[in-house]
Amino acid sequence: MSCMGAAVNIITTDGPAGRAGFTASAVCSVTDTPPTLLVCLNRGASVWPVFNENRTLCVNTLSAGQEPLSNLFGGKTPMEHRFAAARWQTGVTGCPQLEEALVSFDCRISQVVSVGTHDILFCAIEAIHRHATPYGLVWFDRSYHALMRPAC
């Protein structure tokens, strides 16, 4: 699977179960009518109960240069330290939106399908926020790669 290039995303939530976030590349568009993304989340992950209870999330697609933030959210760093490392605003669902993200998709989880060790979260997009002309970031062959042209 390391040969499948993918955008690098930080998935965030906030709500009754608390605030949490993790790095994910298993994210993709499902349909534009209604606008829906999918996010894959391991049920054994420490953040799974928080996302499962809150039922909202924000997909923050990272720009080139945000590799350290991706690494922070991809490790065992305490949540308060993860969120302290960047600037956030609150989306319409109440989820944290990364101010410098390439794009942020504010979503409600509309359906969950379990496959193997993971839940596939189908996410109905409620709002989209784009940042002005950043460069994209992808994960390919177990390393980061910056896109050479503006992604949007």
UniProtKB/Swiss-Prot annotation:
Q: Please name the top-level EC class of this enzyme.
A: oxidoreductase
Q: Which GO terms describe its molecular function?
A: FMN binding; FMN reductase (NADH) activity; FMN reductase [NAD(P)H] activity; riboflavin reductase (NADPH) activity
| Keyword Secreted appears in the UniProt entry | no
InterPro entries for this protein? Flavin_Rdtase-like_dom, NADH-dep_flavin_reductase, RutF, Split_barrel_FMN-bd
Q: Which GO terms describe its biological process?
A: nitrogen utilization; uracil catabolic process
What is the recorded function of this protein according to its Swiss-Prot or TrEMBL entry?
Answer: Catalyzes the reduction of FMN to FMNH2 which is used to reduce pyrimidine by RutA via the Rut pathway.
Listed NCBIfam families = RutF
Q: What is this protein called?
A: FMN reductase (NADH) RutF
Taxon lineage? Bacteria, Pseudomonadati, Pseudomonadota, Gammaproteobacteria, Enterobacterales
